[in-house]
């Protein structure tokens, strides 16, 4: 199946799928342009580089509130944990940095950031064991996978019920794998990408799907218990991740998972044209 792409000679104009002028193609040119845009984004630019926290910032003292200080980049904390004896402190710093940059709202759970850090620390008490956990391929039925452990339901603040942090779990593992050079790479589960992915599946894989194929839908959970709700999220992410993997294979890996994520996210958020 051939994919028709409308290409522009202008390096600052995206290539698009023919007949879909709002759907950027998954090309090397588009990836290079979007990655340049990412590096101009004040939030993400700081996080993808080694940027230490503000003077006086301590992740253990500023778990839920930075007090107006910069909490440090996730790249900083992951690199530091390979050389600093205070592994737990660096792990907590990384949790806070990923949560802050991606607005995944761990603090909507009771003691969310600290609790999630403790969950990771329990199964990966040092950087070597963390890399080992990151190297495990994701399987939605593996209850000991790091994504599964992190995304278990936690008590939500101010209301009855649990909150599942699947977006944070996948993003933490993706950031950690990149920074620590793990062999396995995780996709980041994202609302914007999950909205657009069915259309990319149709174009690149010739697999038509309903618009909500890769969405976590509240109405489907009405009769589920807490364990089933957690498994449902893992299953949706498993399909989402597998779709991305097959699309990348289809285009001969001319871009990677992060670049696909960025092309879709920035284009569909309206930040680039």
What are these regions (language model features)?
Residues 42, 100, 176-180, 268:
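Short alpha-helix boundary/capping elements
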Residues 2-75, 80-81, 185-273:
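C-terminal accessory module of base-excision DNA glycosylases/AP lyases that mediates lesion recognition
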Residues 75, 92, 98-127, 168-172, ...:
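Aromatic-enriched hydrophobic runs in primary sequence
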Residues 87-92, 164, 168, 189, ...:
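Residue-level detector of well-ordered alpha-helical segments, enriched
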Residues 70, 75-76, 80, 85-164:
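Helix-hairpin-helix/helix-loop-helix acidic hairpins
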